[in-house]
Amino acid sequence: MFEVRMADILVIGGGGAGIRAAITAAELGQRVILLSKGPLSRTGITPVAGEGVEGAVNEGDSSELHYEDTVKAGRGLADENLVNALAQDSIARIHDLESYGAKFKKNPDGSFATSLRPGQTHSRNLFIIGGGYGLAASLFRKLCRLPNILLIDDAIVIKLLIQDGKAAGAIYLDIRTGEVHVVSARSTIIAIGGYEELWPFTDTPPDTTGEGLAMAYQAGAHLIDLEMVLYYPGVVVYPPAARGWLVQYEYILNPDILDGRVLNGKGEVFIGGFPARDEFMRAVRDQVKQGTASPHGGFYVDLTQSRYSREVLTERLESWLHQFSNLKQVGIDLRDDKLEMAPAAHYCLGGIKIDEFGRTNIEGLFAAGEVTGNVHGANRMSGNALSETQVFGNRAGQQACEFAAKAGVMPGSYEAEVLREYKTVNGWRAGKDKGVRPIELKARLQDVMAQFVGLERDEQSLNDGLAEVCKLRKDVLPLLTVLPIRRFCYEVQEAYEIRGMLDLAEIVILSALDRKETRGHHYRLDYPQTDKTPYHTSIRLVKGEHKIATIPVTKLKS
């Protein structure tokens, strides 16, 4: 009926952090099973990420300055031990990527080409050729050379297994066969990305649904700062053919690269300089409130007033902005045409609370990448996301191996839990009068989140949103129905996703209600001030009840 596969290390997630964790664990001699929701190296956020990765490689720069810039960019909310680990390890992990086959843009003398991004005191963004896909492909090639890894894709994890308070593996659904199986492991690493798909306008892939984060919460994981969602200012909102494409404003506005402008609906420049993402997002929000936004609620980027010649612009657009050619295919030439953009959900700053070694509050459970919550704080600096995947993927892999070496075999009886999942799936397949498909329920949830938990929040809107989410879970979720087929029934995956999304939406809203201040990407109309002392919002599930608290930000160990 079901299989139990044994591993020393179970890695959940096939993006940059998960693959890096699996590589480290396998190189340390552990038997590794990696579960990925989609095809490895072509799923999740990593393959669609931009080309920037941060590392202090230039003369005059240092890991100490990288640390200081990141702490400042996080608006006081980044845990300093984690930031220190990120800054100290990033260069070594970049060299690892080169050894795996990743290619970087280089200067004529062979040094790394870099660019300056908002918040950096030194030019620190390196360029991976091929962007996130180039990174993912190099990791995948390295992974395939290691003999002690079992890769299972088209697998959606249903439940984390906890025995005697320790992580013991997971139950997953094989989408290809429709069968439910178990991985029993001495330690587990969760690296499943963010939850941007809670909102309808995002530049991330549709599998960034966050149900794995809800699953970790149900298992007892300590979550932190879930209200902090980074809205990237520069995502195409019109024309429809390009909606959701990220166009890096850091290149557009950089006077040394493209020297562009940002204009409101009246054609006026409304922000100058080189703003950080949260500052830019708030400026766009102000244009919307004043009625001076572009027709679709955003702004325009304009290169027609650039000080550079058309020839120089062409060379730089082709070299620095891969979206240039894509936009031309849908009728937009950035040299001649204004492009309408708006803020979109781009990166989840909240997630599982970890220490600098990727350890969570559950013994044997480790986490890395965007699923974690206390690395960047209330705003993330460009390029640190890909660095984070490699630094903390490696650290979590190392620590998981140390734990597994000391852990005994975790025997268990899983039949009852597996049968429970078959019953759930069969209930969805049975069909219901007036049944609701997963995609319909997802759209309704996204509408709620956009209306009540968007760029601007207040107590009334958040409470209204919470009531709507609870109503959807109580009245609509029981009507969920999927196609009555077993093999490759992706509606079953979507059903599990929306079930987890509803759970996650509730605790995101509870966290937003608890943070009675404005900080970074969290803006409260009723609490526009920023508190003098930064704090984390912490939420845990204790005996079936949500326990919310404020906890201090971790300072750097001396």
Predicted regions and their residues:
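Glycine- and aromatic-enriched mobile tails/lids
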Residues: M1, R5, G16, T24, ...
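Core beta-strand elements of the Rossmann-like FAD/NAD(P) dinucleotide-binding domain
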Residues: V4-A7, G178-S187, N361
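Short beta-strand "acidic-cap" motif of Rossmann-like dinucleotide-binding folds
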Residues: Q30-S36, I224-D225
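Conserved N-terminal glycine-rich FAD pyrophosphate-binding loop of Rossmann-like flavoproteins
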Residues: G38-D69, R75, L230-V236, A241-L246
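Helix-loop-beta segment of a Rossmann-like dinucleotide-binding subdomain
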Residues: G76-E80, S111-A136, E196-P200, F299-V312
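Conserved redox-cofactor binding core of oxidoreductases
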Residues: R93-E179, A191, Y232-A241
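Glycine-rich loop(s) and the adjacent beta-strand/alpha-helix scaffold that form part
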Residues: S187-A242, N379-Q399
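An anion/pyrophosphate-binding glycine-rich loop and adjacent beta-alpha core
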Residues: M215, A221-D333, D337, Q390, ...
